[in-house]
């Protein structure tokens, strides 16, 4: 079902046949691997379109997913702002995937992630036009200065956002901004003419 390979020193998990309608790329850490089968089953149940899935391992989560440096929110580990290098790696991965899996020019690439990877996916949408769709599941839109960054136009045809309905109830002064920020994010995208779905889910 899955193929595990390595590209430029990073572990990549591949799923799906060749010549698909969509290609979803998801940056994750190792803890998400055990949830992969259920994720793909859920995706398959939600659409009749063909898709393939590429999971990219991110060993330094706070460093490689953060768009710019920021102080720690939980614990002592801050954010070093290494997302630019990760973006370059993923952009270079796209032509490799097109060649390796016979993806046509009509195949649409989607970048999606959870938490800080959701923020990274949104940030990438502002920085590069390669991905037609962006998925941010509980994206870390509380990130310092994110509200100012999103005043510019995004390079995406569609954006999906979701948030757990209990996430704003945290006592952390930074994290409690998440609902206000994600609703602001959707409002800005809609004003830019970008179709955007925002869903609140249990949790």
Which residues make up each language-model segment?
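Serine-hydrolase catalytic machinery in alpha/beta-hydrolase-like enzymes
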Residues: 8-11, 15-102
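Cell-envelope and extracellular/periplasmic
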Residues: 19-22, 26-30, 98-101, 116, ...
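A conserved amphipathic alpha-helix that caps or lines the catalytic cleft of carbohydrate-
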Residues: 40-43, 125, 186
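Short helix-loop-beta connector
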Residues: 104-107
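Short beta-strand immediately N-terminal to the catalytic nucleophile in serine-hydrolase-like folds
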Residues: 110-113, 137
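Gly/Ala-rich beta-loop-alpha elbow adjacent to hydrolase catalytic centers
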Residues: 112-117, 121
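A conserved short beta-strand
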Residues: 130-142
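The feature captures the conserved acid-bearing segment of alpha/beta-hydrolase catalytic domains
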Residues: 140-203
């Amino acid at each position: 079902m899955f193929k595990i390979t390595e590209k430029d020193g990073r572990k990549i998990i591949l799923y799906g046949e060749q010549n698909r309608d969509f290609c979803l790329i998801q940056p994750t850490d190792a803890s998400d691997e055990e949830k992969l089968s259920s994720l793909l089953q859920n995706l398959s149940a939600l659409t009749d379109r063909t898709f393939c899935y590429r999971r990219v391992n991110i060993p330094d989560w706070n460093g490689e997913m953060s768009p710019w440096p920021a102080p720690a929110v939980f614990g002592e580990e801050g954010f070093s702002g290494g997302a630019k290098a990760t973006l370059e790696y993923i952009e270079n991965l796209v032509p490799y995937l097109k060649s390796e899996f016979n993806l046509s020019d009509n195949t649409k690439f989607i970048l999606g992630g959870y938490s800080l990877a959701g923020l990274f996916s949104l940030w990438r949408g502002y920085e590069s036009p390669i991905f037609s769709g962006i998925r941010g599941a509980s994206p870390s839109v509380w990130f310092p200065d994110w509200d100012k960054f999103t005043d510019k136009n995004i390079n995406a045809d569609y954006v999906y956002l979701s948030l757990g309905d209990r996430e704003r109830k945290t006592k952390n002064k930074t994290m409690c901004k998440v609902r206000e920020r994600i609703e602001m994010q959707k409002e800005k995208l809609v004003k830019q003419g970008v179709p955007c779905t925002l869903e609140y889910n249990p949790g």
